[in-house]
């Protein structure tokens, strides 16, 4: 079966934004104009096509990013048919993991901002994630019909708060209830979408007289931005004072793909104005899979290899999302980087080092699907029938094994205990939690050794609320939920060398394990590193993994207060063994004892998670808000002016002090202040607090 759409006509894009910028409505309009959905689903009615989990329809927020394939030929049918794969991503801060995961497999993104609230804290997070993965992007300033909408202000915020070179390619005609349409600053024409057919048709008109001067000035800025793409264009522009439409578009495309500029459009998805032009901009300015650098990976001999977007290259794909579907079981969403995968074919999971077989391949339209015979380089689809695949695993050709870079996922910061309500719920709960953890790497499940309680940990209270909710709905598990607990951690601050010795020799077969360990702190976020420095076989090779295992078990159980130890390097540099009495168990215990003893000598400290908190409050309550944050051991990092006399307070506050903050803030401000928080970093807990926690845990 040959390729139906040439790869240069593919666009793999994400629609990203913070909560309530109108991203899902925008995606809905995209599906409508591309002819895939015949009746527009409204988020207000709980009927949007991409929000297909019941909780999303109730809460009006998007939780799982559904991948949707659509086709577009342009507003004036000016293009050959392009295939646009859209990944709708959640904007709530507890789901940043989903956003991170989507950006990893996209070639470009459309970032949606609200015309009245502009750049919000969550927008900054998303923007930083897109920077990290070098994702070229376009901006769509939505909700231009809302009270307080101001295109220029949002553009300035993007320039100042996000540090981006933002080049508008449109200008709004009117705003708030007078929002009429947009001016195309490349063609220098006004676009007027029809109100009678939901914006399916439009007319070009002359630019309104009152906007002519401003449009001319913005057109000039845009052409200058295009001219900077090359010396030849700049010379032509300086000589002739103008560039052709094709030259402008080609140059802006090149600079967008190089992440030098960000083009901005505006409109109102809800009022059916502007989304069609965003689709044209996606085709005109965002990259096809062949326009971005080939993905690099590591082969079996640890050499770096590239996988070009080519059907003839060996097959390589990344699993970026696992979803459980009540009808077909597990769906593994994959982005194919190179080669071809046929349904029914075998693949190799290079991270788990296992061979698997793909049963069927389906292409998802928000909530229905078409079966495919095969997928090729550049495709995004879902595979059915894979047994043991986790988010971030690489699937590849068994004869050309490669590991594409893994995604790094943040440590969870909040833990709650869950108990099944009845014996029948007990078994179901285990299965449900296992499935949910496979879907979401930022969610962890463990059993507390002492209390035998099941503990679930995640990125915030909303994250865990939704997990508990999904257990009830999708798996029919009723459970009681405990009070949230802070996920403290431990680490060390100095370097030590320490002996770990486990000897039991009293007649018959004994136990003998003896190691010398060097334990030292690593920088924050580095994780655990084990170094084998044994020379001359003083500890036999077959016992070394056991030492590593013993150390890791002790790290998991902590040394101060039973919390996991982070960011240490342990080097095994000496030891001894007994011909008869040494075995794996003895060396495992020796490693564990050595680590515990050493960590207690290496200035151990208790770490607490600190959150980046941003409070939006009317000026009258500013004093109370700041005073309250100080009382919660918060460090105020700065204050900004928002719109209409509203102040923004930026602070860093320990998570343990933030429980119940929503209620306190509401009552302190009569419900007029709001806040958002996200995990920032682990820091040393103050001595008095650490002491109290350690005492209560021991």
Swiss-Prot record:
Segments passing through the bilayer: none
Biological process according to GO: ribosome disassembly
Residues in tr-type G domain copies: 8-290
Compartments, record wording: Cytoplasm
UniProt keyword annotations, A-Z: Cytoplasm, Elongation factor, GTP-binding, Nucleotide-binding, Protein biosynthesis
PANTHER family, alphabetized: RIBOSOME-RELEASING FACTOR 2, MITOCHONDRIAL, TRANSLATION ELONGATION FACTOR G-RELATED
Protein name, as recorded: Elongation factor G 1
Annotated organism of origin: Shewanella frigidimarina (strain NCIMB 400)
């Amino acid at each position: 079966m040959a390729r139906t759409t040439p790869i240069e006509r593919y666009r793999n894009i994400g629609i990203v934004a913070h909560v309530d910028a109108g991203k899902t409505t925008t995606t809905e309009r995209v599906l409508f104009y591309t002819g895939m959905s015949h009746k527009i689903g409204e988020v207000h009615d709980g009927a949007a096509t991409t929000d297909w989990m019941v909780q999303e329809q109730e809460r009006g927020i998007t939780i799982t990013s559904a991948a949707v394939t659509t086709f577009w030929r342009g507003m004036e049918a000016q293009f050959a048919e392009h295939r646009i794969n859209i990944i709708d991503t959640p904007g709530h801060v507890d789901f940043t993991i989903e956003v991170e995961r989507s950006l990893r497999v996209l070639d470009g993104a459309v970032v949606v901002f609200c015309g009245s609230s502009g750049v919000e804290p969550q927008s900054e997070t998303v923007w930083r994630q897109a920077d990290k993965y070098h994702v070229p992007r376009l901006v769509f300033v939505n909700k231009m019909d809302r009270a307080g909408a101001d295109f220029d202000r949002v553009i300035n915020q993007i320039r100042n708060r996000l540090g981006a070179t933002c080049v508008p390619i449109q200008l709004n005609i009117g705003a708030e209830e007078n929002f009429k349409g947009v001016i195309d600053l490349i063609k220098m024409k006004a676009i007027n979408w029809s109100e009678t057919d939901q914006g399916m048709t439009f007319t070009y008109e002359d630019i309104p007289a009152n906007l002519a001067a401003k449009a001319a000035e913005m057109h000039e800025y845009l052409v200058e931005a295009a001219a900077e793409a090359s010396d030849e264009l700049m010379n032509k522009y300086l000589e002739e004072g103008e560039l052709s439409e094709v030259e402008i578009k080609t140059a802006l495309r090149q600079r967008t793909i190089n992440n030098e500029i960000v083009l901005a459009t505006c409109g109102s998805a809800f009022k059916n104005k502007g989304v069609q032009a965003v689709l044209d901009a996606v085709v005109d300015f965002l990259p096809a899979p062949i326009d971005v650098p080939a993905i690099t990976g590591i082969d079996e001999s640890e050499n770096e290899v590239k996988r070009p977007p080519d059907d003839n290259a060996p097959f390589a794909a990344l699993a970026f999302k696992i979803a459980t579907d009540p009808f077909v079981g597990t769906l593994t969403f994959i982005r194919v980087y190179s080669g071809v995968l046929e349904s029914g074919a075998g693949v190799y999971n290079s991270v788990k080092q296992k061979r698997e077989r793909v049963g069927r391949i389906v292409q998802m339209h928000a909530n229905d699907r078409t079966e495919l015979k095969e997928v090729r380089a550049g495709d995004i689809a879902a595979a059915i029938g894979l047994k043991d695949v986790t988010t971030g695993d690489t699937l590849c050709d068994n004869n050309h094994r490669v590991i594409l870079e893994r995604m790094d996922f943040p440590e969870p910061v909040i833990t709650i205990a869950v108990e099944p309500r009845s014996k029948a719920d007990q078994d179901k709960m285990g299965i449900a939690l296992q499935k949910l953890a496979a879907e979401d790497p930022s969610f962890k499940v463990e059993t507390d050794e002492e209390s035998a309680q099941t503990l679930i940990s995640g990125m915030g209270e909303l994250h865990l609320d939704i997990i508990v909710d999904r257990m009830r709905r999708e798996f029919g598990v009723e459970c009681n939920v405990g009070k949230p607990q802070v996920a403290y951690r431990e680490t060390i601050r100095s370097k030590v060398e320490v002996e770990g010795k486990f000897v039991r020799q009293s007649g018959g077969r004994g136990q003998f394990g003896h190691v010398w360990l060097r334990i030292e702190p690593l920088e924050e976020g580095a994780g655990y590193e084990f170094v084998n420095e044994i020379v001359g076989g003083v500890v036999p090779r077959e016992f070394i993994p056991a030492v590593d295992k013993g150390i890791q078990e002790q790290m998991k159980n902590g040394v101060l207060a039973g919390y996991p130890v982070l960011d240490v390097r342990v080097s095994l540099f000496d030891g001894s063994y007994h011909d008869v009495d040494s075995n794996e168990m003895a060396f495992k215990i020796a490693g564990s004892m050595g680590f515990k003893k050493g960590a207690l000598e290496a200035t151990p400290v208790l770490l607490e998670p600190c959150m980046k908190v941003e409070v939006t409050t009317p000026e009258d309550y500013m004093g109370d808000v700041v005073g309250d944050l100080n009382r919660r051991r918060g460090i105020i990092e700065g204050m900004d002016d928002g719109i209409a006399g509203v102040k923004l307070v930026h602070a860093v506050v320990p998570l343990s002090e933030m429980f119940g903050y929503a209620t306190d803030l509401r009552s302190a401000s009569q419900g007029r202040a709001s806040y958002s928080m996200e995990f920032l970093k682990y820091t040393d807990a103050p001595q008095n607090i650490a002491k109290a926690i350690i005492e209560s845990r021991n």
